[in-house]
Amino acid sequence: MLVTEQIDALRAVIREHRQQGKRIAFVPTMGNLHNGHLTLVREAKNHADVVIVSIFVNPMQFDRAEDLVNYPRTLSDDCALLEQEGVTAVFTPTPAIMYPQGLETQTFVEVPEISYLLEGAMRPGHFRGVSTVVTKLFNIVQPDVACFGQKDYQQLALIRKMVRDMTMPIEIIGVPTVRAEDGLALSSRNGYLTAEERLIAPTLAKVMGWIGEQLPARQTAIPALITEAADKLNSAGFRTDAIDIVDAETLLPLSGQSTEAVILMAAWLGNRARLIDNLVVNLRATTR
């Protein structure tokens, strides 16, 4: 398995496989890998002959400098896991390689509207950083297919729109969220939880499931539903950051034409862990 921070070295390896007619899959990550990331890799292997993984903690998408500094970096362990999964190459660029002129003068890619909805409204510039780095990585790897987790629902929607709008010849595959046995979505952020907080954390998914059960019958009372859900989270020890219930396709408020909604949850637990989760709900489902 090749591990390189050099663009030319990575492209040379990819070129060899392309010349052999092989299909290339790509999984972009920020490292600190867990089974959720490895599930993306395994799904990528189902769609291609060669899997490329990137590990890059992208400074452009962090809105708080301390979060960038404190983000866990576990490169040796990550590479060991990826080698076990049969990954062909791991791209580990530095910020200087990805942004040689610095961030201030870097050309950026911005997906209109969706970049500033919901999570984007709370984190200005975050999704611009995501779309820019993913575009750069796509240009470097030029994959046939790329895999992203559905846990970051808005990010996946943004990438799909960007690829469609820019006519990139890349198939985007959304991979279902991987959960622990108690329902907690796997996330690098879970490492910030204390033992006591870890016991509380599955409540986020439970409250989300409760909203999903209530929603088909309460589509005209969404503000009250959100308030009740936030009260449940706060009573359990969370600090609710956001609960949004929007059209699953457009991420805009529900309308009479909406057939599916997505529940987007974000809440702080303790001082460091901001947990997110989501659930798609069929609004035409028969209510019990």
Curated annotation (Swiss-Prot):
SUPFAM superfamilies: Nucleotidylyl transferase. It catalyses: (R)-pantoate + beta-alanine + ATP = (R)-pantothenate + AMP + diphosphate + H(+). (R)-pantoate binds at residues 61, 155. Its EC number is 6.3.2.1. Keywords: ATP-binding, Cytoplasm, Ligase, Nucleotide-binding, Pantothenate biosynthesis. Pfam families: Pantoate_ligase. GO terms for cellular component: cytosol. ATP binds at residues 30-37, 149-152, 178, 186-189. Coiled coil: none annotated. The active site is at 37 (proton donor). One of its GO terms (biological process) is pantothenate biosynthetic process. InterPro entries: Cyt_trans-like (IPR004821), Pantoate_ligase (IPR003721), Pantoate_ligase_C (IPR042176), Rossmann-like_a/b/a_fold (IPR014729). It comes from the Bacteria. Beta-alanine binds at residue 61. It is found in: Cytoplasm. Homodimer. Belongs to the pantothenate synthetase family. PANTHER family: CYTIDYLATE KINASE/PANTOATE-BETA-ALANINE LIGASE, PANTOATE--BETA-ALANINE LIGASE. The reaction proceeds by a bi uni uni bi ping pong mechanism. This is Pantothenate synthetase.
